[in-house]
């Protein structure tokens, strides 16, 4: 599973996730990508479940790029704990994903296989998703 090797701060504030992603909105490495249509925190377990769903459907063919990394810890207090007494203990790791961010990319498999693999991966995630195709530069192919 994806976890950071070291972090500067063990506990972080939640912050806000407003607006679209600033970068990573296009398919850069592969041929097809899975794009988020909502903003949400995605845990390292959800990322791993999506990766396994894709690679199993593709029968270990092709290549998968994971373009998000869970670098923030999330905390929770015990169930019967009263208010106050500080912030809870770190429970796991999350990746903040904003709207329009491409989270996964796939290459090296036929289009229908890639689309089905990305659809299965999207079912494992807590956001609505869209499958996007890599656009050619300027609407033309680069075969000059």
From Swiss-Prot:
Superkingdom assignment: Bacteria
Cross-referenced PROSITE patterns: RIBOSOMAL_L16_1 (PS00586), RIBOSOMAL_L16_2 (PS00701)
GO cellular component: cytosolic large ribosomal subunit
Disulfide topology: none
Alphabetical keyword list: Ribonucleoprotein, Ribosomal protein, RNA-binding, rRNA-binding, tRNA-binding
GO molecular function: rRNA binding; structural constituent of ribosome; tRNA binding
Function in brief: Binds 23S rRNA and is also seen to make contacts with the A and possibly P site tRNAs.
Keyword Membrane: no
Keyword rRNA-binding appears in the UniProt entry: yes
Sequence similarity: Belongs to the universal ribosomal protein uL16 family.
Gene: rplP
InterPro entries: Ribosomal_uL16 (IPR047873), Ribosomal_uL16_bact-type (IPR000114), Ribosomal_uL16_CS (IPR020798), Ribosomal_uL16_dom (IPR016180), Ribosomal_uL16_sf (IPR036920)
GO biological process: translation
Organism per entry: Limosilactobacillus fermentum (strain NBRC 3956 / LMG 18251) (Lactobacillus fermentum)
Region Disordered, annotated ranges: 1-20
Self-association and partners: Part of the 50S ribosomal subunit.
Biased composition (Basic residues): 1-16
Name assigned to this protein: Large ribosomal subunit protein uL16
Pfam families with a match to the protein in the record: Ribosomal_L16
């Amino acid at each position: 599973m994806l976890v950071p090797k070291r972090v500067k701060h063990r506990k972080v504030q939640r912050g806000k996730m407003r607006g679209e992603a600033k970068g990573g909105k296009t398919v850069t490495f592969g041929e097809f990508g899975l794009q988020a249509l909502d903003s949400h925190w995605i845990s390292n377990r959800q990322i791993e479940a999506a990766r396994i769903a894709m690679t199993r459907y593709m029968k270990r063919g092709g290549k998968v790029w994971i373009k998000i990394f869970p670098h923030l810890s999330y905390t929770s207090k015990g169930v019967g704990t009263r208010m106050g007494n500080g912030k809870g203990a770190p429970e796991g790791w999350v990746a903040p994903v904003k709207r329009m961010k491409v989270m996964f990319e796939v290459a090296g498999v036929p289009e229908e296989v890639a689309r089905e693999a990305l659809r299965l991966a999207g079912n494992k995630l807590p956001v609505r998703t869209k499958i996007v195709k890599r656009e050619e530069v300027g609407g033309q192919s680069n075969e000059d």
